[in-house]
């Protein structure tokens, strides 16, 4: 009798494991990882989660959280966008040409242009037709009362084609906000971006990579990386350490400044997100506490902001 019970339990656990593994491969690996565009995860996140935590939020970034002074996701998102803009040197300058690669829904471009001279132009590209359509519709809505955004050009474009698309144009500033870790060839993107800069141009990037002390021997780290790389469509070649990322960046640009802001991004983002989502769903608060702590304690990524200038390759 005891033997039969053991066999039954083992069989049940095996069935559960196979079912869970099958569901993971069907839902995560097939639906998210194998899409021709890496944007389905963001559309899903925005519709199912972000709108619950921060209604009307069109940003797709972790934000920059300043201790207790940042209390909402929208504030954190704006903090990050304002921070990189202030590093760009675009303030009070005329006729500046800006390229935003991986613009998503274009929220940052609308915010940046409010602080720019009307003679400037922002070219914003993304691989997602749906997200570009959304951005263009927002431009049209804004222009119903004013022409303040007429110099923002949203277009669908694959990152691998940017050098060909803009071969007769040079940019004073190129932004890459939380997008480069998705690209099949991030190193090539860096090289192409450098080619598109004016002689005094700047490249400003916020990006995600593995922590230097990441260990594949830790099962929870490995599980976290596996899930996130599948869900957010991160190619295996981009799962490199922060030090390796620094070298990759320096091979393409003159790097002026690199800031590790991991402590001001992932941790506070996960705690706020989990608490707010659980609270808005009217579930017990301890669930948000547990989920937030789990993500904070197990996430293996670093978050860096870099300010670069054009490198003249011989």
Feature names for model-found ranges:
Residues 4-51:
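N-terminal auxiliary segments of SAM/dcSAM-dependent transferases
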Residues 75-94:
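Conserved alpha-helix/loop element of class I SAM-dependent methyltransferases that forms part
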Residues 99, 105-143, 149-161:
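Class I SAM-dependent methyltransferase SAM/SAH-binding core
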Residues 163-174:
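A short acidic, Gly/Pro-enriched loop at the edge of an enzyme's catalytic core
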Residues 187-202:
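A short glycine-rich, Lys/Arg-flanked "PGG" loop and its adjoining helix->strand segment in the class I
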Residues 204-227:
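Conserved class I S-adenosyl-L-methionine
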Residues 236-252:
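Short alpha-helix
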Residues 253-282:
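Conserved catalytic loop of SAM-dependent methyltransferase domains
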């Amino acid at each position: 009798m005891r033997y039969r019970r053991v066999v039954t339990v083992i069989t049940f656990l095996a069935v559960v494991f196979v079912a869970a593994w099958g569901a993971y491969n069907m839902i995560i690996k097939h639906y998210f990882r194998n899409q021709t565009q890496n944007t389905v995860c963001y559309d899903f996140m925005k519709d199912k989660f972000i709108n619950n935590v921060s209604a009307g939020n069109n940003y797709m970034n972790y934000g920059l959280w300043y201790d207790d002074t940042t209390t909402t996701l929208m504030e954190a998102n704006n903090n990050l966008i304002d921070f990189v803009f202030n590093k760009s040197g675009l303030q009070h300058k005329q006729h500046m040409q800006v390229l935003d690669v991986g613009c998503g829904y274009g929220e940052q471009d609308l915010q940046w242009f409010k602080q720019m001279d009307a003679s400037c132009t922002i070219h914003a590209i993304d691989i997602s037709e749906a997200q570009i359509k959304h951005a263009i519709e927002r431009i049209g809505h804004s222009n119903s009362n004013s022409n303040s955004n007429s110099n923002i050009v949203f277009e669908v474009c694959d990152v691998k084609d940017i050098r060909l698309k803009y071969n007769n144009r040079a940019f004073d500033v190129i932004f890459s906000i939380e997008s480069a870790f998705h690209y099949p060839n991030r190193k090539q993107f860096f090289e192409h971006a450098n080619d598109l800069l004016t002689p005094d141009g700047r490249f400003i990037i916020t990006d995600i990579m593995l922590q230097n002390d990441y260990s594949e021997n830790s099962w929870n780290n490995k599980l976290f990386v596996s899930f996130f790389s599948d869900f957010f469509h991160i190619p295996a070649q981009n799962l490199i350490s922060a030090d390796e990322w620094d070298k990759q960046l320096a091979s393409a640009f003159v790097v002026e400044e690199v800031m590790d802001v991991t402590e001001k991004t992932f941790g506070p983002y996960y705690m706020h997100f989990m608490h707010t989502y659980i609270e808005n769903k009217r579930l017990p608060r301890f669930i948000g506490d547990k989920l937030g702590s789990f993500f904070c304690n197990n996430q293996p990524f670093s978050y860096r902001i870099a300010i670069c200038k054009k490198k003249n390759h011989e």
